[in-house]
Amino acid sequence: MRRSPRFSPLWLALLAGPLCSGLVLASPEVHLYVDGKPVAEALTLDKGTVSLTHKLDKGSHQIRIGDAGNSCGTSFGPTEAKPLPFGTAQPMDKCAKGTSFTLRVMLAGDYEFTFNPDTPSLKVLRATRKSEFKRQPPAEPCIAWDGGPVTVSLKGVWPDGTRLRDAYSKQEAVVKQGKLTLTPSKESGGLLLLEPVKAAKQAPFSWDQASVYFLLTDRFHNGDPANDHSFGRQKDGQDEVATWHGGDFKGLTEKLDYIKSLGMNAIWITPMVEQVHGFIGGGEQGNFPFYAYHGYWALDFTKIDPNYGNEESLRTLVDEAHKRGMRIILDVVMNHAGYATLADLQDLGLTDLTQNSGKLPATWNQWRPSGGLNWHGYNQFIDYQSPDWNKWWGPDWVRAGLPGYPQPGTDDVTGTVAGLPDFLTESTKPVGLPPLLAAKKDTRAKALPNASVSDYLIAWHTDWVRRFGIDGFRADTVKHLEPAVWAKLKQAGTAALKEWKAANPDKALDDLPFYMVGEVWDHGVAKDFWYQNGFDSLINFDYQREFALPQAQCMAGSDPTYASYASRINQDPEFNVLSYISSHDTKLFFGDYQDVPLQRRVANSFMLLPGGIQLYYGDESGRGLAKDGGVFDQSVRSDMNWQEIGSGEKAELVKHWQRLGQFRAAHPAIAAGSHKKLSDAPYSFVREKGADKVVVVFAGRQP
């Protein structure tokens, strides 16, 4: 395409005179320059704010905007060489002929540049995947299916005359001469899910067959907009990377039937206790305000954060989940508390810990960066050398880099996670309430006799079990605490749930003991000492990293994993894992390729996996990535894509996951049974546990 002509300022002045009064002039155009080279897409100066996306490699890049002649008036850059931070619009000089911004890129990928020629200013963010080139997964060889009937040998599995049903398509057929022939539904991806028409009596629930739906409460569904801005929490008016989005217990309760339709028997919710009220700077360069929407930065472990709801809405959630046969797993943090934010120091009356507070607005949480500062700039108002930090958590409770506090160590237990105040869980010293809670008027925390830090934390967490009937814990940052502390938490949780069931016999689902699954970072399918210290299961990091993609591309390649998991997990009643394809700390499976057919295929291989499984909200609906502000894990915490699943391919995707999930829910043998391969082409296997028996057939991939 031919570009519009460009004119120097002299020619523009001449053309503006009488000789050219009847002409319509082309809008002036400039380009984004990266490392001295122009990006092909032109930016038109008279159309207001414009954006473009450009792929950058990891490393440092020189960034400016201008024309080929570097002309004053159309040459935009900083007045002097300086870094270009992510997420914050940086002022520019329109006559910056020899200066550029330096942009440090940590992850190669697409980056979005937003240029306002009127200010003028430039902002950069890591682009969402929607604007990136759609990648293709690496090729994976697979058996082929022509779309026609498939015959599978069932000799030794069911006798002749047995009537079977394909749970996916609802077709039925009879075993004849040890074989059965059916045509898989095209929507199934070549699957037959064979079960006897006369089904065995369903076995009672066991945690061995856990199918867990994991969600970030704040990002799932907003049922009560009135609680969206508790403690004066604000939107940032930009990309809302890490602000509170409004999800709450009421919204989750409204979606319980949806979760049940996916075949889930448990729901893992992120920590619900009162979080720090304010924000910190997000990312290395302070690109955005980072609130504790996720739940991992606690302030008061005895209170529900009002952004999530209140005790009434929590009780309703638990009771309604139980009515549907679903358990509630609560995420708990024993390792650390939240950061000190401006809002907390003001709300808790800890003003002695600040400096230059006269420059703050009346409501400190309304501070915004200006004058070239980024969101880390709030730190200038906190006096980290004040002798009054003993009024905060106090040196008997946490280690932190503060005056009078124990200093962080270098091992897993005594080191800090992301600089968060680290609880002294290894200490056996009796302590009183931490000073900030002793002075907090609305806390439920009470001093306990002869209690250590870990004793308090255990008491606070298990109180939710005793009062509301929480069925289990997902333990955060497990390896950063002593194993014995986790064992004590499990014992206390078991006692608390037993008490609740005794007091609420009409609400108790069963007499199963308390359940605990742990996050030991990078743990795989291995039984170790953690299982002797309170844990029924551990999160399996291996499956997403090693197996999810290739087995989604060709389910026939799943058999070694299926056989290994069934043998190692299902022959040991005291061993299990929780496998996943997406999580809040790693990545979204859908985010890598944005491929709906691939997302259907991963349902086939993943939902038939032995052992426990964890479905991350939106796996079933192709939820996309959010803007991350340069912090990769923020992208995987986007809002649930309810608006996309009412119709079209995303609605059909959800139906596919529902069929797989309901089949898994109906048959304990899938998660907890023995596994035996029957044939290679078509790939087929039998799972069996007690009276429950199913056969799964994968005909192959269609060309």
Where are the regions that the model predicts?
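Acidic glycine-/aspartate-rich tracts in secreted/extracellular proteins
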Residues: 68-73, 219-221, 667, 702
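Active-site-proximal helices and loops of the catalytic beta/alpha 8
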Residues: 132-179, 183-190, 195-197, 318, ...
